[in-house]
Amino acid sequence: MTKRNEAKYKIDRRMGQNIWGRPKSPVNKREYGPGQHGQRRKGKLSDFGTQLRAKQKLKGYYANISERQFYAIYVEATRLKGDSGENLIGLLERRLDTVVYRAKFVPTMFAARQFINHGHVKVNGRRVNIPSYKLKVGDAIEVKDASKQLALVLEANQLAERDVPDFIDADHNKQTAKFVRIPHLADVPFAVQMEPHLIVEFYSR
């Protein structure tokens, strides 16, 4: 198992959930945390513990976004009109790495970040190598020509474990996608329950 996979699956083990719905997740076989004390029965979490866990799970899902970056997204969410929890999800789903993953150009969130860093992705015809780049409705995303036949891309296109959500219009023949609309929480195909309202409560303490 690569170091990248070890880090990814460590998140699953720590949460005790298969947060991406991957067939090879270790929690499909055992539902306890990593380490020698992982099998101990966990007591009931406090409100703070529940809120913290919700934050860790959402951060982990989006390829372990740093606390600094995640908090900045939260602050932006609170400044937008409407429900802050919904806004938080909308902003996370507008990230280029998220959309590259949702469009099934790569197999994992972690791979999306690396794929973009290595210059394989264009937005509106221009190469973008910033995973956190914030997309607008109508933006066109494309795998650059030299990368369209990479095994990583072709294998991701065929993944049966997840579908492209309807807020992204993907064409795997051309390896292009369009960001159609900003999704609500209910639109996002999370494999496990996410609770952004608890994250709002956590930061509002």
From Swiss-Prot:
GO terms for cellular component: small ribosomal subunit. Residues 18-49 are annotated as: Disordered. Keywords: Ribonucleoprotein, Ribosomal protein, RNA-binding, rRNA-binding. GO terms for molecular function: rRNA binding; structural constituent of ribosome. Pfam families: Ribosomal_S4, S4. InterPro entries: Ribosomal_uS4, Ribosomal_uS4_bac-type, Ribosomal_uS4_CS, Ribosomal_uS4_N, S4_RNA-bd, S4_RNA-bd_sf. Transmembrane segments: none annotated. The keyword RNA-binding applies. Residues 94-157 form the S4 RNA-binding domain. GO terms for biological process: ribosomal small subunit biogenesis; translation. Belongs to the universal ribosomal protein uS4 family. Part of the 30S ribosomal subunit. Contacts protein S5. The interaction surface between S4 and S5 is involved in control of translational fidelity. One of the primary rRNA binding proteins, it binds directly to 16S rRNA where it nucleates assembly of the body of the 30S subunit. With S5 and S12 plays an important role in translational accuracy. NCBIfam families: PRK05327.1, rpsD_bact. This is Small ribosomal subunit protein uS4. It comes from Nitrobacter hamburgensis (strain DSM 10229 / NCIMB 13809 / X14). The gene is rpsD.
